[in-house]
């Protein structure tokens, strides 16, 4: 399980000392079957965000077999497990999320979801299984701990406001020096690790707008205030916010995903409704887009005698990796001979960002796609699956991080 890295003589007391280097990949590989077993159980019994009662109990049951302090519930139904070392090393936290999605699974696999209309279609079952595997390995080597290891199992990542802020408010990062997390990613092949310093994921904001006009007969538009035409005008004008008012080297997205109005060919409705999303990596841009949308609506209201309701919900914070923690992720991957790549900026959101607002740390992606096994479906898709052989790579990455952080 280990190999001797160095052997030298300590001339002060004339003894030969050995520095030991663990083969974390070998240890993680030995835990592979166990992690797969954990993941397959979780995959069969998915639960929606903020409703994860059975999942919570299952995780607590696994942790209660280990020598760690378990704190629960943290927030609504989060779990914090702490392994305490004897030395002066830091306290490093790892986080896994465990909620599922309202998706009907279409995979024909022995571990298919048994909960109708609910599926682990984003890999959170894998995240939880990996961290439980890492916790078991840490438990087996707890006598060597120079610092403390905290495992944070988080509910409700998929739906705003997200579970992370509630868990932070309830003290899950108390005494934690640094935090790391991963997301299994089917778009990247197994055996790869992706990350980047600074911004990596966006803030996923949501908005909804109702334009209130005055309905009437389709043949007598002069007697109406047509909300459909005004909504169309707003949607087209809003396209200029990103293209004409934002520095082209900065990233932003404004997308309308839903428009609803009317129910008949010859009736102009009273109102029109739309919903959409705004994605940015920077809160100044986020505020700029919101303000510009509101000004457009104000102008249309004055010009057309309409009223409107503009509801803008700020999503998770943009996810920004801390430089030094990113370097640790990169070095760990290179030391473990994993294929490390610098990630592209991603317009998706992830509430791990809230942990990084209050503690240094880094988030990385672990490739779990495998074309040979036909595991290529995107996240949130009814055919989504993960290459379970990716678990040992993520687990060895976490263990190597503990070594580099002087905890193990």
Where are the language model's segments positioned?
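Intrinsic-disorder-associated, low-complexity terminal segments enriched in Asp/Asn/His/Tyr and depleted
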Residues: 8-14
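Short, small-residue-biased leader/transition segments that mark boundaries at the very start
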Residues: 1-4
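Histidine/acidic-residue-rich, glycine-tolerant segments that coordinate divalent metal ions
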Residues: 79, 101-103, 109-119, 126, ...
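Acidic/His- and Gly-rich active-site-bordering loop/insert found
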Residues: 20-120, 125, 129-132, 136-145
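Metal-dependent amide/peptide-bond hydrolase catalytic core
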Residues: 232-408
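Divalent metal-coordination and catalytic microenvironments
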Residues: 42, 81, 94, 124, ...
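Non-cysteine beta-strand/loop elements that form the S-adenosyl-L-methionine
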Residues: 93-95, 207, 363-369
């Amino acid at each position: 399980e280990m190999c001797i890295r160095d052997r030298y003589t300590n001339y002060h007391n004339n003894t030969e000392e050995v520095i030991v280097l663990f083969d974390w990949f070998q240890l993680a590989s030995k835990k592979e079957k166990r992690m797969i077993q954990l993941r397959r159980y979780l995959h069969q019994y998915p639960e929606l965000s903020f409703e994860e009662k059975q999942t919570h109990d299952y995780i607590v049951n696994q942790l209660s077999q280990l020598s760690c302090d378990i704190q629960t519930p943290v927030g609504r139904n989060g779990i914090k497990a702490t392994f305490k070392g004897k030395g002066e090393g830091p306290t490093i936290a790892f986080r896994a999320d465990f909620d599922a999605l309202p998706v009907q699974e279409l995979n024909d696999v022995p571990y298919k979801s048994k909960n109708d209309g609910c599926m682990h279609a984003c890999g959170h079952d894998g995240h939880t299984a990996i961290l439980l595997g890492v916790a078991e390995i840490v438990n087996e080597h707890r006598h060597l701990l120079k610092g403390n290891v905290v495992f944070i199992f988080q509910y409700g990542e998929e739906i705003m406001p997200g579970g992370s802020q509630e868990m932070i408010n309830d003290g899950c990062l108390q005494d934690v020096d640094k935090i790391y997390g991963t997301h299994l990613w089917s778009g990247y092949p197994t055996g790869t690790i992706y990350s980047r310093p600074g911004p990596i994921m966006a803030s996923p904001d949501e908005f909804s707008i109702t334009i209130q006009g005055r309905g009437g007969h389709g043949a007598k538009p002069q007697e109406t205030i047509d909300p459909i035409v005004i909504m169309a005008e707003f949607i087209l004008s809003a396209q200029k916010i990103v293209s004409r008012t934002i520095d082209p080297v900065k990233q932003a997205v404004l997308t309308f995903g839903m428009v609803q109005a009317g129910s008949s060919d010859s009736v102009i409705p009273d109102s029109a409704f739309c919903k959409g999303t705004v994605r940015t990596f920077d809160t100044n841009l986020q505020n700029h887009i919101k303000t510009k949308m509101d000004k457009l609506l104000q102008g249309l209201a004055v010009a057309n005698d309409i009223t409107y309701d503009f509801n803008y919900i700020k999503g998770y914070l943009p996810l920004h990796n801390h430089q030094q923690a990113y370097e640790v992720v990169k070095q760990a991957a290179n030391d473990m001979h994993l294929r490390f790549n610098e990630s592209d900026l991603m317009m998706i959101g992830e509430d791990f960002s809230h942990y990084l607002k209050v503690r240094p740390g880094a988030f990385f992606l672990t490739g779990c796609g495998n074309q040979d096994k036909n595991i290529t479906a995107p996240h949130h898709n009814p055919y989504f699956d993960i290459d379970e052989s990716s678990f040992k790579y993520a687990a060895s990455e976490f263990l190597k991080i503990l070594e580099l952080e002087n905890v193990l």
